[in-house]
């Protein structure tokens, strides 16, 4: 029997849906999901998605860079690192009023979550009053709030929680095995420690990674395994497709096979069935057909607007047109809660 004939005999119902509650996702288990026939993988991911979410609703988030450039970290993918010559000019923290103006515009454009990102290793104490004021102001507009500011101390996480921050983003970026090839100034454990502080403060965790940085499929599976085995797994999982920026160490990295990106979305959905899975940076590299496949694979959120920190993003009008063609509607944050 040929390999194709063997694959054809596999029934989708025989494919494991998810690990039992008591079982951790081993890397080998996640690799096995990646290696399923493409149609079977998407079929199973869509089944899992429909068990927990409205399959035709996508939550829209807008991301604003509130402090751009000059970061002390040496992340090999990032244009904002002071270690790389990308021509990006470092800027100071934005004024609160300017941030709130941007939030109003995002809400008028259909976003239900407003994310604020600062290029820091960690925020300083002098920044905290402005940051907490931003959180309170954005919440008063009726938007969900999210911040990504680097590593946090316990007290800082508590301050943000007291201000009403809904989500804190701190990505693992990649697998532990590949991590050292991308970053040297922050350890993997540093990232895990910040996630613990955020969770202990009562803030929802937003945590994902970047694929297409030259890692192997097994290393992609290692990232998903790490995320799925967090206790609990993240409420929100952004999946970024590398944007190879000139002047960064990864500028010459070969593009990832787009079907591998779709596979990653599907595997994230299966292993983290109640998480919101978000299409993030690099979405402009996907044509409409591939984005539709991502929604079929279980993506149910995306960053919306013309710029994602310092990388471009598909125009809002184009996104609306795609939603109309697919019969997808935007959903507010409350409606995106997973079904029991």
From Swiss-Prot:
Pathway: Cofactor biosynthesis; biotin biosynthesis; biotin from 7,8-diaminononanoate: step 2/2. Its cofactor is [4Fe-4S] cluster; [2Fe-2S] cluster. Binds 1 [4Fe-4S] cluster. The cluster is coordinated with 3 cysteines and an exchangeable S-adenosyl-L-methionine. Binds 1 [2Fe-2S] cluster. The cluster is coordinated with 3 cysteines and 1 arginine. Residues 56-283 form the Radical SAM core domain. [4Fe-4S] cluster binds at residues 71, 75, 78. Belongs to the radical SAM superfamily. Biotin synthase family. This is Biotin synthase. It comes from Burkholderia lata (strain ATCC 17760 / DSM 23089 / LMG 22485 / NCIMB 9086 / R18194 / 383).
């Amino acid at each position: 029997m040929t390999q194709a004939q063997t694959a054809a005999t596999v029934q989708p119902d025989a494919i494991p849906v998810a690990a039992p509650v008591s079982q951790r996702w081993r890397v080998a288990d996640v690799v096995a999901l990646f290696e399923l026939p493409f149609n079977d993988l998407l079929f199973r991911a869509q089944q899992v998605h429909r068990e927990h979410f409205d399959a035709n609703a996508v939550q829209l988030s807008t991301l604003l860079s509130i402090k751009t450039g000059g970061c002390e970290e040496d992340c090999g993918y990032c244009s904002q690192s002071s270690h790389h010559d990308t021509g990006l000019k470092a800027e100071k923290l934005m004024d609160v009023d300017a941030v709130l103006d941007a939030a109003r515009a995002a809400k008028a454009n259909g976003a239900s979550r407003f994310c604020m990102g600062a290029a820091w290793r960690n925020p300083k104490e002098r920044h905290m009053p402005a940051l907490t004021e931003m959180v309170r102001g954005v919440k008063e507009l009726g938007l969900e709030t999210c911040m990504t500011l680097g590593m946090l101390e316990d007290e800082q996480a508590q301050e943000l929680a007291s201000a009403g921050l809904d989500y804190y983003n701190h990505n693992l970026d990649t697998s532990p095995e590949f991590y050292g090839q991308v970053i040297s100034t922050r350890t993997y454990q540093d990232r895990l420690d910040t996630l613990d502080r955020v969770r202990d403060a009562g803030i929802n965790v937003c945590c994902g990674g970047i694929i297409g940085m030259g890692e192997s499929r097994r290393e992609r599976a290692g990232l998903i395994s790490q995320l799925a085995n967090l206790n609990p797994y993240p409420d929100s999982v952004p999946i970024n497709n590398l944007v190879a920026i000139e002047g960064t160490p990864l500028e010459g990295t070969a593009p990832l096979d787009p079907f591998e990106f779709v596979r990653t979305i599907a595997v994230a959905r299966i292993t983290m069935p109640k998480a919101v899975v978000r299409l993030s940076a690099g979405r402009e590299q996907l044509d409409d057909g591939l984005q539709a496949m991502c929604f079929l694979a279980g993506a149910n959120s995306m960053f919306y607007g013309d710029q994602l920190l310092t990388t471009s993003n598909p125009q809002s009008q184009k996104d609306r047109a795609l939603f109309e063609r697919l019969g997808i509607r935007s959903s507010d944050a409350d409606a995106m809660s997973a079904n029991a």
